Amino acid sequence: MKLTCVLVVLLLVLPFGDLITTSNTEDNKRGATPWQNSLKARGVCSTPEGSCVHNGCICQNAPCCHASGCNWANVCPGFLWDKN
């Protein structure tokens, strides 16, 4: 039972790990990883002014997309790979 609880918590937290552990400021940017670059290359994300076409996210600060959809609030706070 404890193992099941741990696995459930990990599955809930892991998709948002990047949002939790990284600061999303202009002077603290990370480069895009190959996986993130391939998202753009496949056309999953479309970045017109503040919107994501394929997943319907509403963006607050910058064009942003995520392959599996929006975050828990249906709002993307500006993912790091879209600011490069």
From Swiss-Prot:
Keywords: Bromination, Disulfide bond, Hydroxylation, Ion channel impairing toxin, Neurotoxin, Secreted, Signal, Toxin. It comes from the Eukaryota. The modification 4-hydroxyproline is found at P77. Transmembrane segments: none annotated. Contains 4 disulfide bonds. The keyword Cell membrane does not apply. It is found in: Secreted. The modification 6'-bromotryptophan is found at W72, W81. Residues 20-42 form a propeptide. The cysteine framework is XII (C-C-C-C-CC-C-C). Residues 1-19 form the signal peptide. GO terms for molecular function: ion channel inhibitor activity; toxin activity. One of its GO terms (cellular component) is extracellular region. It comes from Californiconus californicus. Expressed by the venom duct. Coiled coil: none annotated. This is Mu-conotoxin-like Cal 12.2d. Belongs to the conotoxin O1 superfamily. Mu-conotoxins block voltage-gated sodium channels. This toxin reversibly blocks voltage-gated sodium channel in cephalopods, with no alteration in the voltage dependence of sodium conductance or on the kinetics of inactivation.
